[in-house]
A protein has these predicted regions:
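Phosphate-/nucleic-acid-contacting segments
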Residues: 6-9, 13-75
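A small-molecule sensor/coupling module
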Residues: 1-5
Length: 75
């Protein structure tokens, strides 16, 4: 699978599952990998790329979506 394809599937999972609240679900990279259907390492690389692009912000063990439109563009 191509990196771009994984990024699109990860963007979809993030848009559907990330809640920008303290009590929102805490998804591990392993959880995300299972949902996307790829290896945890690929999820880690993809999350770093999405953060570099300004789409998300990783804060400790939680994720915050900064630019949902950018994530939608990856679908």
């Amino acid at each position: 699978l191509s990196f771009r394809h994984v990024m699109g599937r990860l963007a979809k999972v993030l848009l559907e599952n990330v809640v920008d609240r303290e009590d929102g679900p805490r998804l591990t990279q392993q959880d995300l990998a299972a949902m996307v259907g790829t290896a945890r390492e690929m999820v880690s690389r993809s999350l770093r790329s999405l953060e570099d692009m300004g789409a998300i912000k990783s804060e400790g063990r939680s994720l915050r979506i900064l630019n949902p439109d950018l994530l939608r563009d990856l679908l």
